[in-house]
């Protein structure tokens, strides 16, 4: 969570964070309910961090009514988690919805992350690329021309470790594939762009 995101969520829900670092004998558990600290202390815990959010906007009905249907919100969260897995492919993620495991990544690199998110068939239809120009490195996977999709949902761009949406990159890749695509088809890719930090505005 970046900046004030986690405390903002904790101010309108019940949040439980359990974390243990490598080398620590015990983990730490922190529970906040609508901004009020309920519990803070040591506990036995596996390595890593889990964040549980419950009763979002339960005490603010005016905000809660603006939430979309449960499935819509779930799909939006699942989409974001999938991008986190791809962006941080050396970190393992376990994502569950209603006690059902949706993603369980191994943290074993790009190919493993792609297979976790999209499946083995997807990975087998991708072409690995790598290009370096001065201080700029572009690498990742693009689809074989025969493996296009009917939406842009399978396009992922990671810039300096962050998932970003960029229409210019999407349009450029589309231009390269256009002559191979049927109507309303789009290329699919997982691209990692690393460049000097002063080249981009993280906001």
Residue ranges of predicted features:
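N-terminal phosphate-binding caps/lids of nucleotide- and nucleic-acid-binding domains
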Residues: 1-203
